[in-house]
Amino acid sequence: MVRLLALFLIVGVLTVKAEVEREFILVSGGPSLHEWEKFKAEPHDRWWGNFIRSARVRIQEIQAKSGPGTKITWLVHKPSYLRRASRQDKQDLIANIVSVRDKYGVNLVWFEEGDELIEYLNAGQPRDRVKIANFEYYGHSNRACWMFDYSNEIDSGSKSWLHENELARIHRDIF
């Protein structure tokens, strides 16, 4: 009888722990290319890692405050970094990003389109047991959308974005 009671107690504790698991989500959009920016009065993104470094610094802050085992998922717009690497920087930017993942032990998820970001938010983890504690975006934006590849493939524009009208597709109960 005592063993059965202990078993129920252990199962109950594990169930409670599973219900309160939290995930921090960081998103890094991509850098622009100099070939588009060089004609502007105020070009930006001279360094490829602006949005990568910002996320890395935040990862360090979260781990310092919440502990090294904290669940952190980092979504990165891969096409932008592949394009920047091949057309401008001539170095393996993907390996640099992966090295951040490896050093800090975070879950790195590559994405190409806003739909993939929404899909991860809604179903990337079992959302009945893993709730999103915090969500942060590092990248280009305007008042209506996040532009994951702004001035990366086309000048002053984006082919990959998440518009405010699409936010309704994010399930409310994931937070």
Feature-to-residue mapping (PLM):
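A beta-strand/beta-hairpin structural motif
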Residues: 26-28
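Catalytic-core segments of thiol-dependent peptidases
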Residues: 30-31, 36, 44, 61-175
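N-terminal beta-strand/alpha-helix entry module and adjacent surface
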Residues: 40
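Short catalytic helix/loop segments, enriched in acidic residues and glycine
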Residues: 46-61
